[in-house]
Amino acid sequence: MSDQPTGRHSAREIVALVADDSTFAELPLSIRNPRPDGPLAWPGYDASRARAAERTGEQESVVCGTARIGGARAVLIAFEFGFLGGSLGQRTGDLLEAAYTYAREHRLPVVPLVATGGSRMQEGMLALTQLQRVARQSALTREAGLAQVAVVRDPTTGGGWATLGAGADVVLALPGAQVGFAGSRVRPADADPAAYTAEAQLAAGAVDAVVRPEELREALGRWLPLLTSPSGTPAPPPEPLGGSGGLPGTGWDAVRRARSPRRPRAAAYLDAYFTHRVAISGDRCGGTDPDGMLCGFGEHRGRTVAYAAQTGTATRPAGYRTAARLIRLADRLGIPVLTLVDTPGAANDAEAEREGAGAAIADLFVAVAGARTPVTSLVIGEGGSGGALALAAPGNTWATADSYFSVIAPELAAAILKRPPREVEPTADQLRIRPQDLVELGVIRGTVGP
């Protein structure tokens, strides 16, 4: 994928790219009559607005309306960068507030198509405080259980990024777009420009995907139906994959089978379970764990299920935070959650500690414990201590025959107890880590499969 900007689109051009044909209808929103040269009586402000209106054909820096995207109806907020750099002023705030209010009244998701340099200088602090208005509308929309899926274009900087962009539930970005809180004219002279791009924000966990303009309609058409289909019914646990070898005979047999490279991993389970799925990426705190935690939403038997799945590696702090983000989003939207447990344990290297491993695991424990939406868990491999338990649903966890769950790895337990290596296998039996042991102990509900 190219990392060069794909060209700037006007507000109506970007609407035409994402909306189903002939479905966009502009909202009949009223805005305040401006004072001469604005609230600060800024010399030449009226003339600047008049030139912007003549050049773009718009009366303000946003165009708001409804449309269908992939058949799903949504409120669209399209920024016109040609109108004073897509900046936010008082009248912009009026339009944004009215659009969000309409979305809540009609139970519609909001899709901001953002391209802005930030707050409008000619309106001073009154422009800056529009960010508080926008944040309030976003918060009310969250409380209403409605999704917000942002598309950040070139450029998206300042308060527009810090509210409508980064504050959305899901963030898509155009390739090569300038994206960041600091715009090009205010960042340090020696700053690396590559850090202020869509691709850099993806790597930093602030963007979920980089999508080419011609693919936006399809991408949004996958996201919106999934995020607007609540269900109070728990997700059923997946059927087991792989051979039917029966339950393990010993604790060490359970460990050996769970660690086998031939055992199906999370990606195989997700592919078998979902008709189609879309992934979220990143913890919104500067990190990602794409090799350790898979998170997103998919369709299972005609309804949406959210998923957070460990891949069999040591889970990084960013992975736990991404899973917590996923569960809280699903909870707000009323979507059931499926988690797949498979890790030898949380990453325990020095870098993981610096990244806040303990706090990240604690956050996931709380997200699962506090979820009102039903959470179903399946242990598909290694259940390594608290790093695995954090993802498991209390009272609704199941296990495959190729799995185990333990307070600690048998080798480490033997070492702590100062037992010789030959005692590792008996220690595994003593720990009672087999799936059938876990059922008998009341740790899990049952096993899946024959």
Task: Tell where the protein language model's regions lie, with residue ranges.
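Short, basic, glycine/proline-bearing loop/turn elements
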Residues: R49-R51, A78-S87, A309-A314, N348-E351
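Intrinsically disordered, low-complexity segments enriched in small/flexible residues
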Residues: M1-I69, R73, R217-V305, A309-G312, ...
